From Swiss-Prot:
One of its GO terms (biological process) is L-arginine biosynthetic process. This is Acetylglutamate kinase. Catalyzes the ATP-dependent phosphorylation of N-acetyl-L-glutamate. It comes from Corynebacterium jeikeium (strain K411). The gene is argB. Pathway: Amino-acid biosynthesis; L-arginine biosynthesis; N(2)-acetyl-L-ornithine from L-glutamate: step 2/4.
C-alpha cells in the first residue's frame, strides 16, 4: 500500500481492470529499483501449498524489477508438528513454550532444514536466486536469553532469545550478488548457546540493519485492527506516533509485529506494512498498487515525498 489511498478489493477484476492495475504499478516498479524490501514470511502463507508458491513468485517478481528482497521466516506450526511427532510437546509458561536444549535442536532443524529449505526450493524453481541462511551464519545475529514476567514473577523460558546485535555484512554480499536471502531466526549468544528468536522481532531488526526501504509483515488478518475483533476498526494507514499510542490496547498476537515495525521505522526504514498473507500475491498487491490491501505505518508527511507521480523522475528517490 502506498500513500493517500484506502485499500482496494482485488476480487472479481475484469481484464480491463487488471490492465489498469498493471499500468498503476509502473511508478512503483521504478520506485523499488535497487531498494531492499524485508518480508516476514508467516501465517497461512507458510502452510497452504498455493500460497507458498504465490509468495515465492512474488519474491522472484521483486528481484526481476530490480528490487532486493530479503525473507525472514519463523515456523511455529511446523515446529509444533515435529515436537508432537517426537513426543516433546513440553511445558508452557505464560503462554510461551519452554525451550529446552533438546527442544532447541528440533527447532533449529525445522527452521533451517525444513521451512527454509522448502522456500529456497520454491523460489529456485524460477532460477538460481535464493540462498538459505540463519542467524548463526557469519555472525548475522547475536542473541541473549529472553526472560518474561508472569503474575509478577520473572520466568526463564530456556532457549528463547532476543537479538542484541545484527551484523548484516554477509547478507549484503548475497544481495549485491543478486541473491534472495531466506533467513531462519535462530541465533547464538556470545558463549555459543543457540536460541530461538521471534521472527517478527528478527525481521524488524534486520530491516533496520540493512537500511531497508520497506518492511512487510504477513499475517492471517487483513491488517491492523485498533479494536479487535471489531472488523470496522481496520485502519489503512497510521503514523508511528499513532501506533505507539495504540500499542498497549492491541490484541496480544499483533503486539510483537507492531513493536518490530516501530523498531524498524526508528532505525530508518521508510515504511512498514501489515498484510493478509491468505491472499495470493499479497506482497505484490500491497507494494505495487496505490490502494494496497493492508495497513501501512509511515511518518506524517511521508506521502508528500513518496507520491507515485514523482517517481517517474529518476533524480528523486
Amino acid at each position: 500500500m502506498n500513500p493517500k489511498h484506502t485499500p482496494i478489493d482485488t476480487t472479481g477484476l475484469t481484464p480491463e481492470m487488471r490492465s489498469h492495475v498493471l499500468a498503476e504499478a509502473l511508478p512503483w516498479l521504478l520506485h523499488y529499483r535497487d531498494k531492499i524490501v524485508v518480508v516476514k514470511y508467516g501465517g497461512n502463507a507458510m502452510i497452504d501449498e498455493d500460497l507458498k508458491r504465490a509468495f515465492a513468485a512474488d519474491m522472484v517478481f521483486l528481484r526481476a524489477i530490480g528490487a532486493r528482497p530479503v525473507v525472514v521466516h519463523g515456523g511455529g506450526p511446523q515446529i509444533n508438528e515435529m515436537l508432537k511427532t517426537v513426543g516433546l510437546e513440553g511445558e508452557f509458561k505464560g503462554g510461551f513454550r519452554v525451550t529446552t536444549p533438546e527442544v532447541m535442536e528440533y527447532v533449529r532443524m525445522v527452521l533451517f532444514g525444513k521451512v527454509g529449505r522448502e522456500l529456497v526450493g520454491l523460489i529456485n524453481e524460477h532460477g538460481p536466486y535464493a540462498v538459505g541462511a540463519s542467524g548463526e551464519d557469519a555472525g548475522l545475529f547475536t542473541a541473549s536469553k529472553r526472560m518474561i514476567t508472569v503474575d509478577g514473577e520473572e520466568v526463564d523460558l530456556g532457549r528463547v532469545g532476543q537479538i542484541e546485535h545484527v551484523d548484516a555484512e554477509s547478507l549484503i554480499d548475497l544481495i549485491d550478488a543478486g541473491r534472495i536471502p531466506v533467513v531462519s531466526t535462530v541465533a547464538p549468544d556470545d558463549q555459543g548457546r543457540i536460541y530461538n528468536i521471534n521472527a517478527d522481532t528478527a525481521a524488524g531488526a534486520l530491516a533496520g540493519a540493512l537500511g531497508a526501504e520497506r518492511l512487510v509483515m504477513l499475517t492471517n488478518v487483513k491488517g491492523l485492527y485498533t479494536d479487535w475483533p471489531n472488523k470496522e476498526s481496520l485502519v489503512s494507514s497510521l503514523t508511528p506516533e499513532q501506533l505507539s499510542d495504540l500499542l498497549p490496547n492491541l490484541d496480544s498476537g499483533m503486539v510483537p509485529k507492531m513493536e518490530a515495525c516501530l523498531d524498524a521505522l526508528r532505525s530508518g526504514v521508510q515504511a512498514a506494512h501489515v498484510i493478509d498473507g491468505r491472499i495470493p500475491h499479497s506482497v505484490i498487491l500491497e507494494l505495487m498498487t496505490t490502494g494496497g490491501i493492508g495497513t501501512m505505518i509511515c511518518p506524517a508527511g511521508w506521502e508528500d515525498i513518496a507520491s507515485p507521480d514523482i517517481n517517474y523522475r529518476e533524480d528523486l528517490p
